[in-house]
A protein has these predicted regions:
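Transmembrane-helix motifs of polytopic, lipid-linked glycan transferases
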Residues: 60-84, 122
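Short hydrophobic/aromatic helix or loop-helix immediately within or flanking a transmembrane segment
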Residues: 2-53
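Juxtamembrane membrane-water interface segments immediately following transmembrane helices
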Residues: 1-12, 216-286
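Membrane-interfacial entry segments at the cytosolic side of transmembrane helices
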Residues: 154-157, 197-225
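Membrane-helix interface segments
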Residues: 54-55, 83-91, 153-158
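Membrane-interface transmembrane helices that cradle and orient dolichyl/undecaprenyl
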Residues: 123-157, 188-196
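Multi-pass, polyprenyl lipid-linked donor-dependent membrane glycosyltransferases
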Residues: 61-67, 92-127, 167-184
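Membrane-interface alpha helices of multi-pass inner-membrane proteins
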Residues: 157-172, 224-228
């Protein structure tokens, strides 16, 4: 986090020291998600401008992040009602969120992971709603009160789906894989629901169910296209235009390198029956 703040103010930092910068005068880089660096850096700048204190800026950031995290958790619990989960279960989950110290501490961390987790939680909830659209569900509370069951996926849920997908894309390096997987799965379920609705209608000579929108899967793919286009523009146009250096490719290779080093350090060779062997100097022989 300290490196991100220094990057935003164009001060030397640990990440810019080892990267081959596109412009030596621009120290902002993609080692950390650039969007998150901009968010926390802007809050610090606001604190300096208004209160003449960087700590005040961090308080602003922490307050906003804590509020967003609490709202996302509350929304996830609220969505359980639309999915037919009973009040006792929702109450237990809400109490767990409220009194488990881990969540309150986690919500105040100055790392990219918190806002990413918030965005991913919203994306996950919306994906589950889309997948459950064609399934029969129970709403005991509405039935007892004589009310109409709530709409599982309303118009505002499209906005939340887009925000969750974009947040997952830009708040973690390589985060595009999350909306890619979520939208593809959700679109497949939506298309399957339409197919089954028409199939049942053909068997019974009835009209297809109105509760299963015909073109919802196209909306999901449109959200995915928005994420792909936004990510392509940001990485291929915006960052080069502002001389923002991408993160090192060594990050992608860190896990294979770590596991290889661990294997060489702790094991004398591969399992029996496997051709390759590891020599004392660490080279792999076939």
């Amino acid at each position: 986090t300290g490196a991100q703040i220094r990057q935003w103010f164009n001060y030397p930092n640990g990440t810019s020291d080892y990267l081959r910068l596109l412009n030596p005068d621009v120290l902002l880089n993609g080692h950390h998600p650039v969007v998150h660096t901009a968010i926390i850096g802007s809050c610090v700048r606001l604190g300096l401008s208004v209160f003449n204190s960087a700590n005040a800026g961090l308080i602003i950031y922490t307050t906003v992040q804590f509020t967003v995290t609490a709202a996302c958790m509350a929304y996830s619990v609220s969505s359980l009602r639309k999915l037919g989960v009973g009040l006792p279960v929702r109450g237990v989950i809400l109490l767990f969120f409220a009194f488990m110290p881990m969540f309150s501490n986690y919500a105040a961390l100055l790392t990219k992971d918190v806002l990413f987790a918030d965005a991913f939680l919203v994306l996950l909830v919306q994906t589950v709603k889309l997948m459950a659209g064609g399934l029969p569900r129970r709403d005991a509370n509405a039935a007892r009160a004589g009310e109409q069951a709530p709409v599982l996926f309303a118009r505002h849920d499209w906005l939340l789906l887009a925000l969750g997908a974009l947040g997952s894309t830009f708040l973690r390096n390589g985060g595009l894989v999350f909306p890619l997987a979520a939208c593809m799965i959700a679109a497949a379920f939506c298309a399957w629901d339409v197919y089954m609705s028409y199939r049942r209608a053909a068997r019974t000579d009835a009209e297809p169910l109105q509760s299963v929108p015909r073109f919802r899967w196209l909306g999901v793919l449109a959200v995915l296209a928005l994420c792909l286009a936004s990510n392509a523009y940001f990485t291929k146009v915006f960052m080069p235009a502002h001389d923002i250096t991408p993160g090192s490719k060594r990050e992608m290779l860190s896990i294979p390198f770590q596991q290889t080093a661990r294997f060489v350090q702790k094991h004398d060779g591969l399992n029996s029956g496997v051709g390759p062997t590891v020599k004392e100097d660490g080279t792999i022989m076939f």
